[in-house]
Amino acid sequence: MPILPVPALNALLTKTIKTIKTGAAKNAHQHHVLHHTLKGLDNLPAPVLERINRRLKASTAEQYPLADAHLRLILAISNKLKRPLAIDKLPKLRQKFGTDAVSLQAPSVWQQNADASGSTENAVSWQDKTIANADGGDMTVRCYQKSTQNSERKSTDEAAMLFFHGGGFCIGDIDTHHEFCHTVCAQTGWAVVSVDYRMAPEYPAPTALKDCLAAYAWLAEHSQSLGASPSRIVLSGDSAGGCLAALVAQQVIKPIDALWQDNNQAPAADKKVNDTFKNSLADLPRPLAQLPLYPVTDYEAEYPSWELYGEGLLLDHNDAEVFNSAYTQHSGLPQSHPLISVMHGDNTQLCPSYIVVAELDILRDEGLAYAELLQKEGVQVQTYTVLGAPHGFINLMSVHQGLGNQTTYIINEFACLVQNLLTSEGDKPNLRA
């Protein structure tokens, strides 16, 4: 296919960005416009990509030596699409982020549900279920299962992943992270349950954590219907979801009394509902392992990565401050409280952890600090830094080949960790200590 002249490519990109930014493409997410546009750019020669980058004033190879021209162009386009963030704009941003995130995903991960008979090796089916949140209301979870090619009875002793989406505790949903959960299920064969927890500012901390704990209790009770064992639940999440995964791991093992208190400055919860939630967490099996991806871990200390990568990338200083404020300012809890900050919780009995950070990420160093803390506590921990990657890279897994390969590698490594744990422990009962 002939390559358009650079000015024509610029015009095409400008038109695409404008269409998405203004919402003129009403159903852009359904047609996966961003996916096809950004993935297609990788077919251009590197010199052409660099010329476009210069015109768009993208970051340079000198600034980010391990980020290739294609990725730097994706970041430049993302910056063009980005709008200033403020707490009162979060509801609108939530809708736009949802549309853009789905538009980035490969169409195939949305089509395979219609062909879930197992005719393809990695066919995955999913179903949305309504369960009770921590306050007795409705909450949606999306359950993924790898389709079987025969009618044999499914095993009930496999691992299952409970996944919490990222988005600063304020944006994101089960659709925005559908591609990653679908991929984990296809690649590992595990059931995956993605949680649509309540978000700030409407529901400040620790509501999201309580909902995630309610989802954990539900999965422990219903795991066998998904072909999994309650003693083989693994936790994962990205960014804010990575924080929630770590907090859930802490609280399942050793819950603290503040979980049962009304900290949201809302009308007091019905005592019966509160008791039901408390009782649901009694004697839960502890998680087998956790996979926090570029997690939020520390709300108080500042790290070098805050200065190095605080501007011009997918998550900047202002974004982090707005998200943090929306999540914590009406919580009635200090930011150092163990229901908010994993660095201040009890990590002494935490499950084995595989902690992933991104090199070009404002949160990189606090993720590494969390891993170091776990090591000091005697927890089995592995870390992996994705070089040249920005915050939120799993949302780019199907538009950038390198990030897709890295995501595949991370899933494989975590699956190996889980398998090694099962082999070494002989699947002994895994109840709270």
UniProtKB/Swiss-Prot annotation:
It comes from the Bacteria. GO terms for biological process: lipid catabolic process. Active at temperatures close to 0 degree Celsius. It catalyses: a triacylglycerol + H2O = a diacylglycerol + a fatty acid + H(+). The active site is at S239, D361, H391. Its EC number is 3.1.1.3. It holds the Pfam family Abhydrolase_3. It is an enzyme of class 3 (hydrolase). InterPro entries: AB_hydrolase_3, AB_hydrolase_fold, GDXG_lipolytic_enzyme, Lipase_GDXG_HIS_AS, Lipase_GDXG_put_SER_AS. Belongs to the 'GDXG' lipolytic enzyme family. PANTHER family: AB HYDROLASE SUPERFAMILY PROTEIN C4A8.06C (PTHR48081), ALPHA_BETA HYDROLASE FOLD-3 DOMAIN-CONTAINING PROTEIN-RELATED (PTHR48081:SF8). This is Lipase 2. It comes from Moraxella sp. (strain TA144). The gene is lip2.
